[in-house]
From Swiss-Prot:
Species in which this protein is naturally found: Danio rerio (Zebrafish)
A UniProt-annotated Pfam family: TIP39
Protein name as annotated: Tuberoinfundibular peptide of 39 residues
Gene Ontology process terms (BP): adenylate cyclase-activating G protein-coupled receptor signaling pathway; neuropeptide signaling pathway; startle response; swimming behavior
Phylogenetic lineage: Eukaryota, Metazoa, Chordata, Craniata, Vertebrata
Family listed: Belongs to the parathyroid hormone family.
Length: 157
């Protein structure tokens, strides 16, 4: 006699069976039972409790860890060739804004009214997109907020 179930319970049964089979395909941990040498209730034990530590099957010994070789930087640079800390540290928010403001104006020809403002916004947007690849989301939001405040000040004059 064939197993005849409605579609939903049959699907549920198949899913449960497949999960069971998939889980049984993984190596099972060799857990040892916890052993305690507890005295009977009401009796004192001078040795104290001794518990055996049980490690799960997923531990560092199961992972193959490969160390990468250190890159060869050659001899240490001396004098002026040595990097100054400021050369490689990331820029602060104010320094990024200053650098972006320097690059915004450029050598654009002056145009009349809204056309000039539109070009500035388009160029600023392109600069923002290029620079934002290097920024985190929070830094990007701060930069955008400060830019919008500056834009409101410029437009209000």
């Amino acid at each position: 006699m064939a197993l005849s179930l409605p579609p939903r319970p049959a699907l549920l049964f198949l899913v449960l069976m497949s999960v069971t089979l998939m889980a049984s395909a993984f190596p099972q941990p060799q857990l040892r039972p916890l052993q305690s040498n507890l005295p009977a209730i009401g009796q004192e034990d001078s040795k104290g409790e001794q518990w055996e530590v049980v490690y799960p099957s997923i531990s560092l010994r199961d992972w193959s860890i490969q160390m990468l070789t250190a890159p060869d930087f050659g001899a240490a640079k001396t004098g002026r060739e040595q990097l100054v800390a400021d050369d490689w540290l990331p820029l602060s928010q104010s320094q990024m804004e200053e650098e972006l403001v320097k690059g915004w104006t450029g050598d654009w020809p002056s145009r009349v009214g809204h056309q000039q403002k539109r070009n500035i916004v388009v160029a600023d947007d392109a600069a923002f997109r290029e620079k934002s690849k290097l920024l985190t989301a929070m830094e990007r939001q701060k930069w955008l907020n400060s830019y919008m405040q500056k834009l409101l000040v410029v437009n209000s004059k």
